[in-house]
Regions:
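Structural motif corresponding to alpha-helix initiation and N-cap regions
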Residues: 58-59, 86, 142
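Conserved G1/Walker A P-loop phosphate-binding module
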Residues: 1-32, 41-48
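Inter-motif core of Ras-like GTPase G domains
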Residues: 58-80, 91-95
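Loop/turn-to-beta-strand initiation segments
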Residues: 45-48, 70-71, 100-101
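Canonical P-loop GTPase G-domain recognition
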Residues: 111-159
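Conserved C-terminal guanine-recognition region of P-loop GTPase G domains, centered on the G4
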Residues: 78-125
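Switch II (G3) loop of P-loop NTPases
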Residues: 44-60
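Structural motif
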Residues: 7-9, 52-53, 76-79, 106-109, ...
């Protein structure tokens, strides 16, 4: 069973991405981690997804949850500078060297994404703004979710 920790700055689109996953099932917590209330967690196609916000991921108390991840899905707002995720990326890299990180640049304006290819990032996927449900919720386009799931599988197989 592979665990994918979805993390990133507040408001970057982590919950939107998890909400948009197809065929969601029940989350099975990894063994030997402390109990934690997760904002979002589910299984999808053999992957266990769980969301941990940036402030929690930067802390030391929940390090077991970082170590349980077989891959990181770092969601960033494309309107922000890549520097906005560098402290979190450094924390993930120091806590879990060798764990692949897929950076998803959300709300992508359609330009080149070379600037987002940061040290410690195995791959970058742009993500369009998606469909707005209401003022607080949106959904990612299904074909983009499929592309992200395929890229995650590739990274996990290569690890």
């Amino acid at each position: 069973m592979n665990y994918v920790m979805v993390t990133g700055p507040m408001g970057a689109g982590k919950s939107t991405l998890i909400r948009s996953l197809p065929e969601k099932g029940v989350f099975a917590p990894p063994p030997d981690v402390p109990e934690m209330f997760l904002d979002n967690a589910c299984s999808c196609r053999g992957l266990q997804f769980y969301e941990i916000d940036e402030p929690t991921a930067l802390g030391r108390h929940w390090a077991g949850w970082l170590g349980a991840a077989n891959a990181f899905l770092l969601v960033a707002d494309a309107g922000a500078s890549p520097a906005a995720v560098e402290p979190l990326l450094a924390r993930l890299g120091s806590a879990c060297p060798g764990t692949p990180c897929l950076l998803v640049a959300n709300r992508w304006p359609g330009s080149r994404h070379d600037a987002w290819q940061l040290p410690g990032v195995a791959a970058v996927e742009p993500l369009s703004p998606g469909a707005v449900l209401d003022e607080e919720r949106a959904l990612v386009q299904p074909e983009e979710v499929e592309r992200i799931l395929a890229r995650l599988q590739q990274l996990l197989e290569a690890a």
